[in-house]
Each structure stands twice: as structure tokens, then as C-alpha cells.
Regions:
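Conserved beta-strand-loop surface patch within small alpha/beta domains used
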Residues: 2-125, 134-231, 236
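Membrane-anchoring helices that localize proteins to membranes
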Residues: 234-246
Length: 246
């Protein structure tokens, strides 16, 4: 079992002061799988559209794998049990598959953090998801390390999805230990915020590596730099690269 450190993506309010609220009614949420009876584990409500978004991202990514941030709110019911409402998701624009792990690149981390802070007002980072085809859902040692170092708040969770089998598995914090959760609640809500990798690029939160490294762009940039005409601002550089790419 993994120890839980402080998380750099945690809400500064902290889980101990999570607002109190009623959980979604039975008419709006359906249990998928078997819920863990332990009151110390968070209960997870995920919007149906979020799950469909993740499943679509995983299918598009194929063997490369997919990942991203889960966005929403951390709450407590009137009896004190923690629960999370996940009604937002950001697809990572770039991942690396390393053995049995899915890794976010440093550029992807930066883009995800920027999107979470600028485009998801009223929501916080509830955790992350990643998808690997053809393997039973599990957390690799590297992914456990990611959960420890980046998603260590008491209410932050991890979702692993296998698009081949359709299996989902969730992990969350029980005190200082990272444990597998039981089922989750599929939640019907119209208010979702979903951000695909292409939207990160459109909003200039992420620039594909090939745009900066393709030979034509490199040569044009080098020539402009020597003439002293290559722009210094990031926005102007992006525009210049696009012009040279045609």
C-alpha cells in the first residue's frame, strides 16, 4: 500500500473542510459494480458524458494509450462520508507508453494544469484517468508514484480503463493508504465540461512537437533568427511557424 503525501494538485481548502451536500438521488445515479462498504473510502459519481468521453479518447488512442485530468467537486454528505462529483475531463495532448505504464510528458502536464486553472471555474482536479488496451486495469509502480506525488489529497482518485474489455477500476485514499475502490455511480447530469486534446491546441495551451521541429520550420526559424526578424513572443512564434508550414 502506498503512503499518501501532500499533493501539488490538491485544493488548499483540504478534505477536512469539504463542503457538505446531499448526494445525487437514486433517480439520477446508477451503481456500476459493487460498492465498497468501507465508509473511509470516497464514493465516486461520474457523469455519463465524462465516461463516454474517456472511452472515446481511449478508442482513438489505440495502443498508444490515453490519459488526462478528472475535474469536479469534492464534498461530504450530512453524515460525513466523502464523495466526489466528476463532471469535467481534460484529455492529455501527449502521452508516452512505457512498458505497462502510461506516462504524461512534461509538456502535457503543463498544458493540463493550464487548462484546469483557466477553463474549469468552480471545479478542481479530482484525479486522473489513463487507458491501456489489452490489460486488466491496474496501477503500475510508476502510476502509483504519480498518484502519490500529484494526486495525494484525501479525495483524489485514479481511474484505469481497458478499452478492449471495457473494464474500469478506481483507486482512492483510505487514510494514508492507496486502495482499490469498489464500483462507481454513473451520474446523469447535463452540466459537463469536456476538453479534448484538439481544444488545448486551439486555445494555444499546447503546441504539437512537430510544429516546432519539422525541418522546414527549423530552417525558416534559423534564417529569421540570423536576420534578427524571428519574433520573441510565444504567440508570434506560433503564428510564424504556421505561416511557414502553409
Amino acid at each position: 500500500m502506498a503512503d499518501r503525501p501532500d499533493s501539488p494538485l490538491a485544493n488548499p481548502v483540504g478534505a477536512g473542510m469539504a463542503p457538505s451536500a446531499e448526494e445525487p438521488s437514486a433517480a439520477r445515479a446508477r451503481l456500476i459494480g459493487q460498492e465498497a462498504p468501507d465508509e473511509g473510502l470516497p464514493r465516486v459519481y461520474v457523469a455519463r458524458r465524462v465516461m463516454e468521453f474517456i472511452e472515446g479518447a481511449a478508442r482513438r488512442a489505440g495502443a498508444d494509450g490515453a490519459a488526462g485530468f478528472l475535474m469536479g467537486r469534492a464534498l461530504r454528505n450530512p453524515r460525513g462520508r466523502r464523495f466526489v462529483l466528476i463532471d469535467g475531463c481534460i484529455e492529455a495532448p501527449e502521452v508516452e507508453s512505457a512498458g505497462r505504464s502510461v506516462k504524461l510528458t512534461p509538456r502535457a502536464w503543463k498544458a493540463l494544469r493550464s487548462a484546469a486553472s483557466s477553463a474549469f471555474e468552480g471545479r478542481e482536479v479530482i484525479g486522473w484517468f489513463h487507458a491501456r488496451p489489452g490489460e486488466p486495469p491496474h496501477l503500475s509502480p510508476y502510476e502509483t508514484f504519480v498518484q502519490q506525488t500529484h494526486f495525494g489529497a484525501a479525495w483524489q482518485v485514479a481511474l484505469v480503463y481497458d478499452p478492449d474489455s471495457g473494464q474500469h477500476a478506481w483507486w482512492g485514499w483510505h487514510g494514508e493508504a492507496l486502495e482499490r475502490l469498489g464500483g462507481f455511480w454513473l451520474w446523469e447530469t447535463p452540466s459537463c465540461r469536456l476538453m479534448a486534446a484538439t481544444e488545448l491546441q486551439r486555445l494555444a495551451l499546447f503546441e504539437p512537437a512537430q510544429a516546432a521541429t519539422s525541418p522546414g520550420v527549423r530552417e525558416a526559424a534559423a534564417a529569421a533568427w540570423q536576420r534578427g526578424t524571428w519574433p520573441t513572443s510565444r504567440a508570434a512564434q506560433v503564428a510564424a511557424r504556421r505561416r511557414h508550414q502553409g
